């Protein structure tokens, strides 16, 4: 009989340590150190590629299929509305507060404890690989994308993100566009019929009324959101251009390239996609992992948020403790019980799948 209490307590202790360490994307080397030390102290062999920590179960057998357990240890920067110290892990009323506690620290430490549980077991029907990755929040080049090609063939991946331990069997893709609206620079006192700020206002209105025809049963509509605007340097000068950032969440009825081509037809500006590779992803509703989840009464849904699933070509699900609505919010937290139950549910699901 394994000691579930030790797995749970170790997970909470590790999460507290990770919260106390600043780990913004591209600067997560110290949290990588902490995860590496956690595994080594338990006599678990691991490798490091940049700030990614990789470990294989002790009796890894290349003739068996392999399950990847992945989550990330980088965070966004704390927003200005924090009332608590984002780097001081504080427990109050069953909640563990701190930056990255919910996204995706809770899922990460729960998956690590799940991996520890299976690590020394012989005669498993599947191999397990643990990947604690960096650069997820910024879709960086040295995160999971750089590691996957170096791993053995992955047959199934579980990506740990806050999903309330419901299983995301599909997730929307993402395109971030830089829009440049050109105009004519002039003194504010003079007539100017080509003010790019006015043109940008009209363009934003057009964007707000764009509706893509194809709706997904799992992922709903394509969603377009202007998230940034930048123009001008002083009050009496009309700028020569305005820069917008457009965030587009793409359902499984369109490829990112199709969305790009459609927007070029209707937006009268320069439109530059930062990346067209982060397409929507999904797994068959008849896949064994989905059927096992349903047998164990897990709920399934389509996720509007992007994760490292977009960078994994094999079948995958997104699953983890915590609530996506708390991600990137001030005074971020996760319930202790969410982590405790998350570890139990991960283990139960993988045991059912491995029968």
Q: Model-predicted segments: where are they?
A:
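Metal-dependent amide/peptide-bond hydrolase catalytic core
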Residues: 6, 169, 178-355
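Predominant activation on well-ordered alpha-helical scaffold segments within soluble catalytic domains
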Residues: 16, 36, 109-112, 116, ...
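Hydrophobic residues embedded in beta-strands of well-ordered beta-sheets
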Residues: 53, 95-96, 269
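Hydrophobic/aromatic beta-strand patches that form the interior of the parallel beta-sheet core
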Residues: 67-69, 131, 156-158, 317-319
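Acidic/histidine-rich catalytic neighborhood of metal-dependent amide-processing enzymes
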Residues: 104-176, 180, 216
